[in-house]
Every structure is written in structure tokens, then in C-alpha cells.
């Protein structure tokens, strides 16, 4: 059998996710190898493997952020960022660190909050 967007929505909600109709369609398009608009079981397994990987990665990000948010104020300083990245297995040049800070530090306060951090990391 095949899984439609409606059925995928039911499955995702049972897993504690709350995707929109558009997100469900994107998920199906992402793994719909034969382009028929539904996903079969192997395609479904591929999708679930990606989702689990994303979830684990987000947990890793939270953990890394917590480790380097020394005073628990919800920010990591620009100086701490290279240590965070190394901790996540990302070896970066000074230029790359500067670029991330420029991208992430929206309010130009020299610190990166958790949301800014996740946005940059998920874009990698």
C-alpha cells in the first residue's frame, strides 16, 4: 500500500510532530522516488530515518548550546562559538566563524541566542 499526505499527517502527529499540509506535501515530495504523489513503505522508512536524524541533531544542538551558555542567560558569546562548533564536529576557520556570527547575530550584540544558533546550524 501507499501513504497519502493525510495518512502521513496522522503518523507524524502520533509521533508528537505537528506538520502543516504544505510541510507534509514537502516531506512526500522529498522521498517520493517514483513521483506518484504518495509514498510506499521503503520511501516512508527513508523519510522516518531523515526525521529521526533531524530530531537527534536538534537535541545535539540544544546540548551543545547549553554546554557553552556558561551563565545560562540564553546566549553564547562570539568568542565561545568556535568551541561549540568543534564540539559538534565542525572544524571552522576564523573566517567561517566570523561569517556565522554575521549571519546569526541579528541584533549585533556580539552574542548568539539559541534560535539564531539553530537557524544557522540547520542551514549547514
From Swiss-Prot:
Protein name as catalogued: Putative calmodulin-3
Annotated residues for binding of Ca(2+) 4: 105, 107, 109, 111, 116
Gene behind this protein: PCM3
Presence of keyword Magnesium: no
Keywords, sorted A to Z: Calcium, Metal-binding, Methylation, Repeat
SS bond list: none
Domain of life, source organism: Eukaryota
Classification lineage: Eukaryota, Viridiplantae, Streptophyta, Embryophyta, Tracheophyta
Modified sites of kind N6,N6,N6-trimethyllysine: 91
SUPFAM superfamilies: EF-hand (SSF47473)
UniProt-annotated binding residues for Ca(2+) 3: 69, 71, 73, 80
Gene Ontology MF annotations: calcium ion binding; enzyme regulator activity
